[in-house]
Amino acid sequence: MQERHTEQDYRALLIADTPIIDVRAPIEFEQGAMPAAINLPLMNNDERAAVGTCYKQQGSDAALALGHKLVAGEIRQQRMDAWRAACLQNPQGILCCARGGQRSHIVQSWLHAAGIDYPLVEGGYKALRQTTIQATIELAQKPIVLIGGCTGCGKTLLVQQQPNGVDLEGLARHRGSAFGRTLQPQLSQASFENLLAAEMLKTDARQNLRLWVLEDESRMIGSNHLPECLRERMTQAAIAVVEDPFEIRLERLNEEYFLRMHHDFTHAYGDEQGWQEYCEYLHHGLSAIKRRLGLQRYNELAARLDAALTTQLATGSTDSHLAWLVPLLKEYYDPMYRYQLEKKAEKVVFRGEWAEVAEWVKAR
């Protein structure tokens, strides 16, 4: 059985989206995992904790014996069935534990005894994690062009359409604003960084990449923060600013935050609960900036939001949301972005409407 153990092997594994059967405990997996990994643990959290305590108190032999005792009989058979099914479903996959130690070797030997030869990651998750960290540091050294612009200018779509674009918000599962959350929960910080590194590796491998196209983001995207090496490079990058008409921006925001989010919530939860989740999502977003709006203005806009939701529920129309969205943009979001842009005005190298910026970026 050929094991993966070189830096290039690790990178090739990530670029190919090689399925990884991660046999670490769920708590370890939740703290950080590779993008193509599925968690089929050798031991659950309680079993792992018991074995760890035994190791500290009685040594490795006693801990190993306890592990075999805990994962035996029906429990072992159930886990074997899950591993066997995963191996058959992912014949090009690979096993992984924390450091390429006993857990992945034990699972590998059990599978071998059952007639399945399956490789493992030498060095385990730790080696893969070091690879993603190093890859991000290296790839972030390439030139970067940032796409800037006020809310609703279609920056994310423009980035998505570039062959050298990386959608940071999509990877973070958050659109970066008070209303930015999606129905997908955000990943742990380590998992987000691993996903970002894998995406950068794949994008770089597809072409002779000269520069990155990224959205002009702050350090935080929801609960995830950008790796410091990338964030530092972004502060030095050139910026192309999208300046679309206000009416076009309103159309985009209506589609993205009202029509699409309502559809997504009702699709996920059903009509009744989905509507409640959608209402809560909008109210939570507005409440998040209450202090900056001031209590009086917040209460006024919250009342307009309630009225707009009542109208939307009765008629299906989202037009009434303009009564609170327009002042929110003009009084809060637009002035805030323009203030931020003024502080880095020397970095702005191009301004234009969406199509003009797209053409400019394409020519780089």
UniProtKB/Swiss-Prot annotation:
Q: Which UniProt keywords apply?
A: Selenium, Transferase
**Active-site residues (renumbered):** 97 (s-selanylcysteine intermediate)
Whose protein is this, by species? Escherichia coli (strain 55989 / EAEC)
Q: GO:BP terms for this protein? A: tRNA wobble uridine modification
Name the domain of life: Bacteria
Residue ranges spanning the membrane: these are: none
Any one Gene Ontology molecular-function term assigned to this protein's record: transferase activity, transferring alkyl or aryl (other than methyl) groups
Q: What is this protein called?
A: tRNA 2-selenouridine synthase
Whether Transferase counts among this entry's keywords is yes
Give the similarity note: Belongs to the SelU family.
What's this chain's function?
A: Involved in the post-transcriptional modification of the uridine at the wobble position (U34) of tRNA(Lys), tRNA(Glu) and tRNA(Gln). Catalyzes the conversion of 2-thiouridine (S2U-RNA) to 2-selenouridine (Se2U-RNA). Acts in a two-step process involving geranylation of 2-thiouridine (S2U) to S-geranyl-2-thiouridine (geS2U) and subsequent selenation of the latter derivative to 2-selenouridine (Se2U) in the tRNA chain.
